[in-house]
């Protein structure tokens, strides 16, 4: 997958029976080069499609799959399928509009493995907000934990998953995550991220700014929301 931080492609090797995770293998991040990151950032900021960028990002995902298989020590034939979310170019959930670049057929050709893709659109058609994978994965991780359970995932955008006693599943975005932090660090210091949270740990929260941010209308909206 490729997230809002636009730092690279994350790939993980999982064995599942569709209900439980039977085995976890290696996980890798294949970083984007500076030139491609700039190209991707440009089309995201404009909300436009680029066949060239789509082709490049699909090739990078294929490379990530090949690296992961090699690192995990498995033959390509042992992988049944690839889940491919692509990269979101624009997302307007209230209008049920979402678009991701990434060519699933091309990825299948490049890897020789079946590909499942474009699951965000189907989630929105069925009343979701276009982010179906994280909550289901969290639910599987929590199979053997005492319920209720809450899991907070801080990616570029932060999201929360609630799993109730009866396995009720509720998930929604809580607000900005690492994306704004990364932008701030880059524009002020020229670094891509606050590695290890060192700068954050050296300071303290500004309560006035935090209170003004918490007044944002998003926090008063009912779920589902993203």
Feature annotation, model-predicted:
Residues 1, 78-83, 149-153, 171:
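Short glycine-aspartate micro-motif
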Residues 13-72:
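Glycine-rich nucleotide/cofactor/substrate-binding loop typically near the N-terminus or early
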Residues 30, 34, 51, 55-62, ...:
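Electropositive phosphate-/nucleotide-binding environments in soluble metabolic enzymes
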Residues 74, 110-114:
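A structural motif corresponding to the C-terminal end of an alpha-helix
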Residues 93-98, 113-193:
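Phosphate-binding/catalytic loop of phosphoryl-transfer enzymes
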Residues 4, 8-30, 170-226:
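Conserved ATP-utilizing enzyme core subdomain
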């Amino acid at each position: 997958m490729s997230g809002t931080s636009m730092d690279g492609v994350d790939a993980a090797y999982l064995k599942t029976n569709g209900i439980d995770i039977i085995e976890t293998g290696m996980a890798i991040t294949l970083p984007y080069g500076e030139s491609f990151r700039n190209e991707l950032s440009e089309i995201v900021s404009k909300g436009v499609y680029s066949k060239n960028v789509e082709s490049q990002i699909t090739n990078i995902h294929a490379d990530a799959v090949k690296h992961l298989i090699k690192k995990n020590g498995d033959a390509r034939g042992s992988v049944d399928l690839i889940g491919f979310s692509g990269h979101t170019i624009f997302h307007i959930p209230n209008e049920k509009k979402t678009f991701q670049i990434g060519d699933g057929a091309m990825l299948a050709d490049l890897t020789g493995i079946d590909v499942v893709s474009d699951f965000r659109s189907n989630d929105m058609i069925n009343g979701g907000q276009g982010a179906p994978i994280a909550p289901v994965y969290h639910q599987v991780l929590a199979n053997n934990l005492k319920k209720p359970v809450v899991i907070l995932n801080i990616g570029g955008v932060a999201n929360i998953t609630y799993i109730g006693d009866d396995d009720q599943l509720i998930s929604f975005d809580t607000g900005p995550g690492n994306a704004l932090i990364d932008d701030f660090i880059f524009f002020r210091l020229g670094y891509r991220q606050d590695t290890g949270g060192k700068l954050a740990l050296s300071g303290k929260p500004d309560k006035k700014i935090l209170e003004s941010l918490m007044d944002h209308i998003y926090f008063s909206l009912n779920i589902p929301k993203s």
